[in-house]
Amino acid sequence: MAAATMALSSSSFAGKAVKLSPSSSEITGNGKVTMRKTVTKAKPLSSGSPWYGPDRVKYLGPFSGESPSYLTGEFPGDYGWDTAGLSADPETFAKNRELEVIHCRWAMLGALGCVFPELLARNGVKFGEAVWFKAGSQIFSEGGLDYLGNPSLVHAQSILAIWACQVVLMGAVEGYRVAGGPLGEVVDPLYPGGSFDPLGLAEDPEAFAELKVKHIKNGRLAMFSMFGFFVQAIVTGKGPLENLADHLADPVNNNAWSYATNFVPGK
């Protein structure tokens, strides 16, 4: 029998029956019981969501014009803009979408890592070097570089040691995500959930859909922020918070335009 209805005759459960669904249990001919995991189908999003569907928010609002036919508003962050036609091919679009989401996450972590040590240093926490693009040079100092300032964790005086640690730390997480977790239970490697969602933020489908939009929007801002940090480091040789403090102290002489004019030929 593929499914069975078992009447429980104990005194505490008299008169009650438990039905084992074929999707959750099977009784084979040799008496073994096999269990299968059932996946609950997500509820469809409400048609009133401003971020999805044909009536979603567009990149120029009411002046956006008609979106390309392949941008249907199915995915978060789709504002109907693809001038270069990068999303026309479904396979290319899927690949680029994954690349964007992953780069968004690294950029958000990177932007936090660029600002937070400098913020702590300005509030009395001692660092060997708090400015993000100067921190790596500590491996060439006499004392080397200690992870988290603790010499008992990783004491590095070699670029290869730093590289190896990054490969292990970053590669392990990415490998875990792409492989679908330790048991291969992850359905969507872009939004794996499970161990990656300990707070259960993805349990409600509508709230999760909105979080995806916030996630991609903040990630795009973070990528622009990282680009700005790179340019600031090259032009001013200072960290982002120091540049901000200089601008607030003297906005007339410390701004993008004043630095750009320094590169005018003949000046």
Curated annotation (Swiss-Prot):
Transmembrane residue ranges: 101-121, 153-173, 221-241
Residue sites binding chlorophyll a 4 per the record: N218
Statement: the UniProt record of this protein carries the keyword rRNA-binding: no
Binding site for chlorophyll a 1: W81, S87, E100, R220
InterPro entries: Chloro_AB-bd_pln (IPR001344), Chloroa_b-bind (IPR022796)
Binding of chlorophyll b 4, residues: Q166, R177
Domain of life: Eukaryota
GO CC entries: chloroplast thylakoid membrane; photosystem I; photosystem II
UniProt entry keywords in alphabetical sequence: Acetylation, Chlorophyll, Chloroplast, Chromophore, Magnesium, Membrane, Metal-binding, Phosphoprotein, Photosynthesis, Photosystem I, Photosystem II, Plastid, Thylakoid, Transit peptide, Transmembrane, Transmembrane helix
UniProt record similarity statement: Belongs to the light-harvesting chlorophyll a/b-binding (LHC) protein family.
Stated name of the protein: Chlorophyll a-b binding protein 50, chloroplastic
Organism: Nicotiana tabacum (Common tobacco)
Name of encoding gene: CAB50
